[in-house]
Regions:
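Anion (oxyanion) recognition and catalysis
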Residues: 147
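N-lobe entry segment of adenylate-forming
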Residues: 1-102, 106-109, 113
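Structured binding elements
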Residues: 150
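C-terminal catalytic core of Y-nucleophile DNA break-rejoin enzymes
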Residues: 158
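Conserved AMP-binding/adenylate-forming core of the ANL superfamily
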Residues: 89-144, 161-166
């Protein structure tokens, strides 16, 4: 069976070609602190700037120490100004005809609603949340809502029965 592979088309690719990839790779090896500092500054919104890119301790590696960010903000909010109506999330059910596309604005609205429900239930920064849901679009809302309010989340395989989970 022959298979044709077609690279995704983009109007503004991050890496133009294989030569640029090799240059970036080489730079990441030769000047890792400068390389990752530049990437972090350009691609992540920070609530508090980091003190050090990498501590170079092999046994206790830490990246962007002292920095503070919010994953939910970086995944959604920072795209609202210029891309609110663009597709942020595509979900497809077991039946391919069952699918949803959400814009950044729609995703933002749903995640904020979910975060507010969690807060009303007493979830706050540092809380631990176990997400036991099927593979539905709301599972993504739950994960992003937890990161939005600073709660730690763990996703449990939805195929386990409630009875089997109580002993785990």
């Amino acid at each position: 069976m022959s298979q044709n592979l077609y690279p995704p088309k983009t109007t503004n690719p991050y890496i133009e070609d294989i030569d640029q990839y090799h240059r970036l790779y080489k730079e990441s090896l030769e000047n890792p602190k400068e390389f990752f500092n530049k990437l972090a500054d350009e691609n992540i919104s920070w609530l508090k700037d980091f003190d050090e890119v990498h501590n170079e301790s092999f046994s206790n590696t830490k990246w962007f120490e002292g920095g503070k960010t919010n994953v939910s903000f970086n995944c959604i909010d920072r795209h609202l100004k210029n891309n609110a109506t663009k597709t942020a999330l595509i979900w497809e059910g077991d039946d391919p005809s069952d699918s949803k596309k959400l814009s950044y604005q729609e995703l933002h609205d749903e995640v904020c609603k979910f975060a507010n429900v969690l807060k009303k239930l007493g979830v706050e920064k540092g809380s631990r949340v176990c997400i036991y849901m099927p593979m539905i679009v709301e599972a993504a809302f739950a994960m992003l809502a937890c990161t939005r309010i600073g709660a730690v989340h763990s996703v449990v395989f939805g195929g386990f029965s409630p009875e089997s989970l109580k002993d785990r």
